Amino acid sequence: MADLEEQLSDEEKVRIAAKFIIHAPPGEFNEVFNDVRLLLNNDNLLREGAAHAFAQYNLDQFTPVKIEGYEDQVLITEHGDLGNGKFLDPKNRICFKFDHLRKEATDPRSCEVENAIESWRTSVETALRAYVKEHYPNGVCTVYGKKIDGQQTIIACIESHQFQAKNFWNGRWRSEWKFTITPSTTQVVGILKIQVHYYEDGNVQLVSHKDIQDSLTVSNEVQTAKEFIKIVEAAENEYQTAISENYQTMSDTTFKALRRQLPVTRTKIDWNKILSYKIGKEMQNA
């Protein structure tokens, strides 16, 4: 082990540390960071070399953050990344600094948004917030309106998590939906992600995702938002139902097959006659 450590350059050590951090399960960033910190034993090297991993983790996980002075949380995503550690809160029309290690928002300031698409963004956000409130008690959503390749685009992100460290499990739901505002009909593209980690008497992770495509009728802002939510609700319900059914099937078949049906003697023990067995007599005489 010592020889291997001597062969690793600082760059290689940081690269390995960054991979551990990026793949930290939901709700376990601090635990992984502290373990990596002990292994690397060089705080300056870790902070300077793995800073990109802290940022990538928060972007990938749709980390929610509370901004002082504002009621609703906002998600940290690539769509709100303004560069130089600043992010956009489209609902409140502010930008703020975000510390990826401490996961804290500071210095909120007013910020310009895409006014040409703001009425569409607001309508979708209003409908999505009502949907999230109904289906995800701990959920947070952020809706962006952006011009991408010359097309006015709506991007809706949802995050919901349950962190139960005392019960040895943590989990997170993420979904991202996009559509462009074009006459008549448009294509809705979504990706749904579930990640759960269970670590009592073992180490099991569920990592699943599903890509979605559907067509959306475009009319006025409010009606289009309603039709969009119908697509989101149907797809997310179907996905969650499928995950539950697959889990039950695995419990009844795959996991059951891993358990030994009979002892190595291929004979079941009749516990009512245990004293007549040799082992029973030995236990009685012990």
From Swiss-Prot:
The modification Phosphoserine is found at S9. The keyword Cytoplasm does not apply. One of its GO terms (molecular function) is actin filament binding. GO terms for cellular component: cortical cytoskeleton; F-actin capping protein complex. Keywords: Acetylation, Actin capping, Actin-binding, Phosphoprotein. GO terms for biological process: actin cytoskeleton organization; barbed-end actin filament capping. It comes from the Eukaryota. InterPro entries: CapZ_alpha (IPR002189), CapZ_alpha/beta (IPR037282), CapZ_alpha/beta_2 (IPR042276), CapZ_alpha_1 (IPR042489), F-actin_cap_asu_CS (IPR017865). The modification N-acetylalanine is found at A2. Belongs to the F-actin-capping protein alpha subunit family. PANTHER family: F-ACTIN-CAPPING PROTEIN SUBUNIT ALPHA, F-ACTIN-CAPPING PROTEIN SUBUNIT ALPHA-2. Component of the F-actin capping complex, composed of a heterodimer of an alpha and a beta subunit. Component of the WASH complex, composed of F-actin-capping protein subunit alpha (CAPZA1, CAPZA2 or CAPZA3), F-actin-capping protein subunit beta (CAPZB), WASHC1, WASHC2, WASHC3, WASHC4 and WASHC5. Interacts with RCSD1/CAPZIP. F-actin-capping proteins bind in a Ca(2+)-independent manner to the fast growing ends of actin filaments (barbed end) thereby blocking the exchange of subunits at these ends. Unlike other capping proteins (such as gelsolin and severin), these proteins do not sever actin filaments. This is F-actin-capping protein subunit alpha-2. The gene is CAPZA2.
